[in-house]
Amino acid sequence: MADDKVKTGAEMWDQRFSSEEYAYGKEANVWLSERVSQINPPPNNRALFPADGEGRNAVWAATIGWNSEVFDLSIVGKQKCHLLAQEHAVSVDYDVDDLALREFPQRSYDLIACSWFHTPSEIRKVHMPRMLHSLKSGGHFVMEGYHTSQMPLQSGGPKSLDLLFDLDEVLGELTGEKAPQMHIIHIAVTSTVLDESELHKGQAMVVRIHLQRD
């Protein structure tokens, strides 16, 4: 059953990314890029961009010195990520993989950054904390996602409360007993105006989290 769900998700995202246009544009997520720009890429660094779709965040990060890696469900997303990387004369490693099935190397990444990584809560509660164990000591986790109050708004995001983020709930998961020891650099629920193609456009309610592993 889990494999069937992955296949269905992959087919959906392959269709979403099938146009020559980039579904969410070619520019990195604004808030993610602002936070990551404040972190100096260490020598021989590794940066992971989960669910980065067509690779806009990972490609941007590669242009400022990060060794970017992506995993996502879509083979079409992988192909478009590599095209975007070629445009910017950088390289990005991209695995077609699923959060719940992926094996994460321990203490390997200096940065994990994601935008709009919405998964069912039963998967998120187990596997997002598990992913954090792949951060090195001092490594950063940066994310932006739609808040539960996004439901009535028409600026993007899933129309399921289970897929949206409640700040207290997700923060409890990311800093709880299943996660490594993390400390909070920034957390917020805020209103913002999105302009990431027609799919993410207009006034939106978002959760923003920046953590660092002890």
Predicted regions and their residues:
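Class I SAM-dependent methyltransferase SAM/SAH-binding core
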Residues: R46-L48, E54-L101
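A short acidic, Gly/Pro-enriched loop at the edge of an enzyme's catalytic core
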Residues: A100-L111
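Short "lid" loop at the C-terminus of a central beta-strand within the Rossmann-like core
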Residues: H118-T119, G145-L153, T192
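Conserved class I S-adenosyl-L-methionine
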Residues: M1-P42
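A short, conserved alpha-helix within the catalytic core of class I
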Residues: T119-M131
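Conserved beta-strand signature within the Rossmann-like core of class I S-adenosyl-L-methionine
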Residues: G138-Y146
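Short alpha-helix
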Residues: D162-Q181, I185-I187
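Core SAM-dependent methyltransferase catalytic element
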Residues: L194-D214
